[in-house]
C-alpha cells in the first residue's frame, strides 16, 4: 500500500503555528536562522524607518496623500531571495517604482522585509503581527490559514511556479524508482513540499524506503553529500546544475497541476479596515504585467539576486513561460488551484482543518483595480 508522502504527526510538529516560541524551536531544529522580521531589502534603500511625506502627486489617485500628508507604514514580508524580496511580479512593480507610487496614492509607504526560513518564516511573521502583507507560496499560506492565522488572498504574484527533483551525480539515481533507499531534502511547509507530495503519490514511491531531511539549505547538503536529492524550484535546479552540483531528474512541466502559486496574502483584519490598500497593490500588479508585456527583460532584472542572476530567471521562463505573471488569475484560476492544495494537504493529514478556497480568495480588489485602470 502506498504511504502518504509525509506522516501527519511529523509535519504538524514541524510547522505548528500556535506561537512564535514553537516556530522558533522548529527553525532552530532544522538549522535555519530565526525568521524575525529582518533588515529592509538592501538592494532597495527605501528608507524604511519613520514616515515619508509625499509632495508630488503619485499614481492614479487624487487622495490627500499626494497633497503632503504623512504616510502610514505598510509592512511586506516574503522569503529571502539573496537579500532581496522574493516578490515575483510584484518585484517588477517594486523595482520600477510602481508599487511605492500606488501605495503613496492611498496614504502608505512600504517597508520590505526578506525573511529567512522561507514559507514557515513568513507564517511566523504573520502570526506575530510583524507584517500586514505576505508574498509567498500557496502551500505555507494554506497551512497558516488552516492553523488559525486570519488571512485573505488578495492577489497573485505568479500563478505558475515550476518545480523539480534535483539529484547528485554521485548518488546513482538514474530513474524515479532509484530514489527509494536514498536521502532527500524537502523543506517542510514550503511549495517544494507540495510538489514532493504530488510527486511521491503520483509515482507510487514507497516513502518507507526514503529518508526525508527537513532543511532549506539544499546547496550545502548536496555539496557535502549529506543528501542524495532535493525537492526544489526549477530555478534552483538550473542554478545547482550550473554550479556542478548534479542534475535535474524530473521537473513539473509534464504535470502542470503539480506546480504551485505565489500569492499576495493580507491580514484579514487589516485589509477589511483598509480595502484601498488591496486595490492599490492590484493596480501595481496590473501595471507591472503591462511592463513585462512590453519588455520581458524587466522581469528577469527585477527578480535577479546574488544567487539567481537574470540569465537564470530567463532560462526558467523559457521552460515555464510568463503566463503565470498575470494578476487576473486571482479571478479565473486561483480558487480552483487553491482548493486542490487544500484537499491534498487535508487528505494527506498535513492540515487538520479543511476549508473552502472561495471563502479565502477575494478577487474584488483586483476587479476594482482593473476597472480603475481602464
What role is predicted for each listed range?
Residues 59, 68, 73-95, 189:
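Extracytoplasmic "Venus flytrap"
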Residues 80-84, 273-352:
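Secondary-structure end/capping motifs
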Residues 25-29:
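C-terminal motif of bacterial Sec signal peptides marking the signal peptidase cleavage site
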Residues 119-132, 146-148, 177-180, 202, ...:
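Short helices/loops that flank or line small-molecule/ion binding pockets
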Residues 30-54:
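Bacterial lipoprotein signal-peptidase II cleavage site
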Residues 343-374:
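Conserved C-terminal helix/tail region of periplasmic/extracytoplasmic solute-binding proteins
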Residues 168-183, 273-276:
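Flexible hinge/capping segments at coil-to-helix
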Amino acid at each position: 500500500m502506498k504511504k502518504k508522502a509525509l506522516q501527519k504527526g511529523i509535519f504538524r510538529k514541524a510547522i505548528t503555528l500556535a506561537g512564535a516560541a514553537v516556530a522558533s524551536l522548529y527553525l532552530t531544529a532544522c538549522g535555519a536562522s530565526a525568521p524575525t522580521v529582518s533588515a529592509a531589502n538592501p538592494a532597495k534603500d527605501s528608507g524604511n524607518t519613520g514616515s515619508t511625506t509625499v509632495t508630488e502627486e503619485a499614481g492614479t489617485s487624487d487622495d490627500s496623500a499626494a497633497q503632503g500628508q504623512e504616510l502610514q507604514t505598510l509592512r511586506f514580508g516574503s522569503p529571502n531571495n539573496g537579500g532581496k524580496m522574493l516578490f515575483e511580479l510584484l518585484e517588477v512593480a517594486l523595482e520600477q517604482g510602481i508599487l511605492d507610487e500606488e501605495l503613496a496614492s492611498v496614504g502608505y509607504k512600504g517597508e520590505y522585509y526578506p525573511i529567512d526560513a522561507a514559507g514557515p518564516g513568513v507564517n511566523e511573521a504573520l502570526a506575530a503581527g510583524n507584517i500586514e502583507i505576505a508574498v509567498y507560496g500557496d502551500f505555507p499560506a494554506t497551512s497558516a490559514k488552516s492553523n488559525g492565522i486570519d488571512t485573505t488572498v488578495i492577489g497573485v504574484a505568479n500563478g505558475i511556479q515550476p518545480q523539480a527533483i534535483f539529484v547528485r551525480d554521485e548518488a546513482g539515481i538514474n530513474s524515479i524508482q532509484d530514489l527509494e533507499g536514498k536521502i532527500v531534502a524537502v523543506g517542510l511547509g514550503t511549495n517544494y513540499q507540495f510538489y514532493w507530495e504530488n510527486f511521491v503519490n503520483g509515482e507510487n514511491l514507497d516513502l518507507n524506503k526514503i529518508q526525508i531531511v527537513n532543511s532549506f539549505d539544499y546547496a550545502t547538503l548536496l555539496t557535502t553529500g549529506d543528501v542524495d536529492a532535493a525537492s526544489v524550484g526549477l530555478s534552483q535546479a538550473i542554478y545547482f546544475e550550473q554550479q556542478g552540483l548534479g542534475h535535474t531528474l524530473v521537473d513539473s512541466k509534464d504535470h502542470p497541476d503539480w506546480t504551485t502559486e505565489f500569492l499576495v496574502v493580507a491580514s484579514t483584519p487589516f485589509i477589511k479596515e483598509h480595502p484601498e490598500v488591496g486595490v492599490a497593490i492590484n493596480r501595481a500588479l496590473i501595471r507591472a504585467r503591462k511592463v513585462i508585456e512590453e519588455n520581458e527583460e524587466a522581469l528577469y532584472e527585477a527578480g535577479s539576486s546574488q544567487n539567481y542572476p537574470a540569465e537564470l530567471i530567463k532560462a526558467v521562463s523559457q521552460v515555464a513561460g510568463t503566463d503565470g505573471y498575470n494578476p487576473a488569475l486571482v479571478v479565473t484560476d486561483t480558487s480552483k488551484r487553491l482548493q486542490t492544495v487544500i484537499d491534498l494537504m487535508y487528505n494527506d493529514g498535513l492540515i487538520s482543518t479543511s476549508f473552502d478556497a472561495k471563502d479565502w480568495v477575494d478577487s474584488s480588489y483586483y476587479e476594482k483595480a482593473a476597472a480603475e485602470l481602464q
